[in-house]
């Protein structure tokens, strides 16, 4: 399942994401991963979740982000939840590119049985219509 936490900058998406990470850590029977750009969440995310600074791996663009997430899933079948903060800062600002990315991620998550939540700094009214068929918008 794919979930998008949407809203303009400063609307509380990261706080919601942190709360969701903590909830997943408490209920998951597997591993929880939180991906961020930079190291701002170091003291906010529960230590039981694997916090990954994507900049440490030189990942840029939606293709790179897709490959990174696919690698996480392929390398660890115990991952139940992946949370990605600042998705547009990692992948790029083009919402049509986001749609193409989400289509690929949806195909992967359906087979891997992984829940992925992305924070997206954009109002949902700006999204291409097809995104609403792929992801749950919050």
Residue ranges and their predicted role:
Residues 1-71, 126-130:
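Conserved P-loop
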